C-alpha cells in the first residue's frame, strides 16, 4: 500500500507506516531494493586489532593517534584505552572479499564480483595500490604490525600483542574512486536511508540519533 511498508526478514514479515534504514554494509543494496537512485557503492574494508597484554597496558595512559596523512583514506593504527580498562591497537585496512568478512579467509563470490565490477573500486586501487599492498602485508605479519605500532610506542614488544577483534568498515565510494567522507542520507516516500555514517558516527551515535529523529518527524509529518 502507498501508506504502508512491508519488511520481509528471516524472522518474519512486518507492516509499518515508516522505515528508517541504517543498513551499514548493506545500506546501498537496501536503498536499491527501495528504488532509491544512488551514486555510490559500499565496499568493505576489514580492520584487524591487537589487544595489549597486562605488561603492555601500562604503556598507554590515554588515546594515542598518529598524525593523519590526508593523501590516504584511512587514519592508520592507533591505541585506544577501552572502558573496561583494556587497550586495543589498530586497525589496519584491507579490502574484504565478503561484505561481512570479519575473518581473513572469508570469501563470497557475489560480494567480490559486486565490488570489483564497480569502476570506483578500481580507481581507488589505482590511486592507493602501494598503501593497499602494505596493509595486506601487515594483516598477515605480526612483526610488520608491531613495527608500525612502534612508531608510536618504540618500547612495545612482540609479547605485548595478543590477537584481538576485527571490524569491517562500510566505505561509501563514489564513481570517481573517492571516499565519501560526510553523512549521506536519502529520503523516499515513507522511508529514510542512512547510506553513509563515517567516523566518528559510533562516538556521536546518540546525537546523530536525535538528528535522524528530527528528520523523521519532518519527513513523515510526525508530532512529538
Model-derived segments and spans:
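C-terminal catalytic lobe of FAD-dependent flavoproteins
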Residues: 104, 110, 115-223
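Flavin-dependent oxidoreductases
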Residues: 1-108
Amino acid at each position: 500500500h502507498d501508506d504502508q511498508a512491508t519488511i520481509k526478514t528471516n524472522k518474519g514479515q512486518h507492516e509499518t507506516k515508516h522505515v528508517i534504514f541504517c543498513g551499514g554494509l548493506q545500506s546501498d543494496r537496501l536503498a536499491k531494493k527501495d528504488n532509491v537512485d544512488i551514486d555510490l557503492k559500499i565496499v568493505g574494508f576489514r580492520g584487524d586489532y591487537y589487544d595489549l597484554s597486562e605488561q603492555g597496558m601500562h604503556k598507554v595512559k590515554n588515546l594515542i593517534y598518529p598524525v593523519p596523512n590526508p593523501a590516504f583514506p584511512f587514519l592508520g593504527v592507533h591505541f585506544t584505552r577501552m572502558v573496561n580498562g583494556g587497550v586495543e591497537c589498530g586497525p589496519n585496512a584491507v579490502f574484504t572479499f565478503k561484505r561481512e568478512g570479519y575473518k581473513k579467509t572469508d570469501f563470497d563470490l557475489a560480494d567480490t564480483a559486486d565490488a570489483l565490477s564497480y569502476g570506483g573500486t578500481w580507481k581507488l586501487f589505482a590511486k592507493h595500490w602501494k598503501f593497499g599492498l602494505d596493509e595486506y602485508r601487515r594483516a598477515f605479519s605480526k612483526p610488520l604490525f608491531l613495527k608500525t605500532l612502534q612508531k608510536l610506542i618504540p618500547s612495545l614488544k612482540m609479547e605485548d600483542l595478543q590477537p584481538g577483534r576485527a571490524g569491517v568498515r562500510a566505505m561509501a565510494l563514489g564513481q570517481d574512486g573517492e571516499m565519501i567522507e560526510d553523512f549521506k542520507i536519502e529520503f523516499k516516500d515513507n522511508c529514510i536511508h542512512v547510506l553513509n555514517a563515517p567516523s566518528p558516527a559510533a562516538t556521536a551515535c546518540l546525537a546523530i540519533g536525535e538528528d535522524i529523529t528530527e528528520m523523521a518527524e519532518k519527513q513523515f509529518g510526525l508530532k512529538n
